[in-house]
Design a protein with these regions (language model features):
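Residue-level signal for inorganic ion chemistry
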Residues: 39, 94, 147, 197, ...
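Short amphipathic alpha-helices and their capping/turn segments at secondary-structure boundaries
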Residues: 12-29, 81-87
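Substrate-recognition "cap/lid" segment bordering the active-site pocket of phosphatases
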Residues: 97, 103-124, 178-208
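Mg2+-dependent phosphoryl-transfer enzymes with acidic/Ser/Thr/Gly-rich catalytic loops
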Residues: 2-16, 28, 54, 189, ...
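Charged, glycine-interspersed solvent-exposed loop segments at helix/strand-loop junctions
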Residues: 136-153, 174-187
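Asp-based phosphoryl-transfer active-site loop
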Residues: 26-46, 74, 197
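Active-site phosphate-binding/coordination module
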Residues: 52-141
Length: 271
């Protein structure tokens, strides 16, 4: 796999990524592990509800949570409720809704919310776009709305055109369009995964640790961009993104890497 002491590949037109000496990867007692879910920990599926947690992953996450003294968090566009449904019965610290909500302690029901739910009329207009073609799936995340077209790739241009028209009709609406892997997501502007991670890093047990973030999609690039502020490490999945120290080919490689973090006697060597 590409995460070793050699130079990994680079995105076309981007500068070469820098080799990652094993000695730079911090001990788990000094690390905050931050993980995207879809396309990073778990394989992408035709529909959001089809994702599943492979055997052994929850055990690995639980052990990492213990070894980092609680400094492990999932960072996702999904809501916290949705994250909990996927990993049930386990619950983890998490930044959900692209930074709209955050939970530090799974044993504490307190959830920090940073945005109101999306306007109902705006949501109704956006939801109508799903009727453009069979195969377009609507996912209401509360703080955002996603139009998945993995089953209708031909509808991509029509979806973005319709969203752009709605946005033009409502120029003052505080919304942002997030293009993803066969998904067009619309959310409140003013918060991102990066803003969520920044707040997370001010709170115990994450405060003062070096973050290690792994993500796969365009929305994860905001977090890649802030890792230098914390002397952190960033890795992409499935593509060679800019601003990362290396990449994994697939979620299975990510899961293997996380297992190796536990297997190595130093807790921090790359496989």
């Amino acid at each position: 796999m590409p995460l070793d002491d050699e130079i990994v590949g680079e995105e076309e037109g981007a500068p070469e990524t820098v080799p990652v000496p094993r000695s730079l990867v911090p001990h788990l007692s000094e690390t905050a592990i931050l993980l995207d879910i879809d396309g990073t920990l778990l394989e992408l599926m035709p529909t959001p509800r089809e994702v599943w947690v492979p055997p052994g992953l929850s055990k690995t996450l639980n052990r990492l949570l213990a070894r980092t003294n609680g400094a492990l968090a999932l960072v996702s566009g999904r809501s916290l409720n949705d994250i909990d449904l996927i990993f049930a019965p386990e619950q983890y610290p998490a930044v959900g809704g692209h930074g709209a909500e955050m939970r530090i302690d799974p044993d504490n029901e307190s959830v920090d919310s940073h945005a109101p739910p999306m306007d109902r009329e705006l949501k109704r207009r956006l939801a109508a776009i799903a009727k453009l073609s069979p195969g377009i799936l609507l996912e209401d995340k509360g703080y955002s709305l996603a139009l998945h077209y993995r089953l209708a790739p031909h509808a991509e241009k029509a979806i973005y055109a319709a969203v752009s028209l709605i946005r033009a009709d409502l120029p003052n609406a505080p919304i942002e369009i997030l293009p993803g892997k066969c998904v067009c997501e619309i959310k409140h502007s003013g918060f991102t995964k990066a803003t969520g991670v920044r707040e997370l890093m001010t709170r115990e047990p994450f405060k003062g640790r070096r973050p290690l973030f792994i993500g796969d999609d365009v929305t994860d690039e905001t977090v890649f961009g802030i890792m230098p502020d914390y002397d952190g490490l960033a890795f992409s999945v499935g593509r060679r993104a800019q601003g990362v120290q290396g990449h994994f080919d697939s979620p299975s490689d990510v899961r293997e890497f996380l297992s190796h973090l536990l297997d190595d006697e130093r807790d921090a060597a790359l496989p």
